[in-house]
Curated annotation (Swiss-Prot):
GO terms for cellular component: mitochondrial membrane. It is found in: Mitochondrion membrane. This is Uncharacterized mitochondrial protein AtMg00140. It is a single-pass membrane protein. Residues 154-167 have a biased composition (Basic and acidic residues). The keyword Coiled coil applies. The chain crosses the membrane at residues 39-59. It comes from Arabidopsis thaliana.
Length: 167
């Protein structure tokens, strides 16, 4: 078995691959002309062959618009669109600033309303205390019943006892 017969079938596929990668159409009698190719160069340096095929594959892949590894996948911006984007960015920036100012104003207003509410509660409490003191007076104001009073059955003057120990 000679070297030509040993490599003829794989070389035929390899040469067809090269034709495909180079966008060439093979000659009509390609299967007959493969045996006449000198294989000494290919048999002596398979690394060279592998490198040349891989570079051809990458160049073929790039013809289809697929980017190589390491390149950015994002498309380049259109220069006509860029001013519009910058204008929109400026508009959004001013809108964000206005919203931030409105939120600050609302927060300060909420704080003011809480303080007013606390002031009103205090005022209502004080007013009710004044009304109770004025209407009842200190002597007519009901005094709290203590546990000691309940236990001894003691009553306040003019009050009905609700004690269980009533005589």
């Amino acid at each position: 078995m000679n070297q030509l017969d040993q490599y003829s079938q794989p070389m035929q596929h390899l040469i067809l691959l090269w034709f495909w990668l180079l966008d060439l159409s093979p000659p009509p009698s390609f299967h007959l002309s493969v045996k006449s190719v000198d294989l000494s160069l290919f048999s002596l340096s398979p690394l060279f062959l592998l490198l040349s095929i891989s570079s051809l594959i990458f160049s073929r892949v790039n013809k289809f618009g697929i980017r190589r590894v390491g390149y950015a996948m994002a498309p380049k911006p259109d220069p006509t669109v860029l001013p519009d984007l910058q204008e929109k960015k400026a508009i959004l920036g001013t809108q964000i600033e206005m919203i931030t100012q409105a939120m600050t104003t609302l927060e300060s207003r909420v704080t003011d309303l809480q303080q007013e509410s606390n002031d009103h509660r205090t005022w209502v409490r004080e007013a009710l205390d004044k009304l109770l003191k004025r209407d009842l007076g200190d002597e007519n104001r009901p005094k709290p019943t203590t546990n000691k009073m309940i236990a001894t059955g003691e009553q306040h003057k003019g009050e009905v006892s609700t004690s269980l120990f009533h005589d």
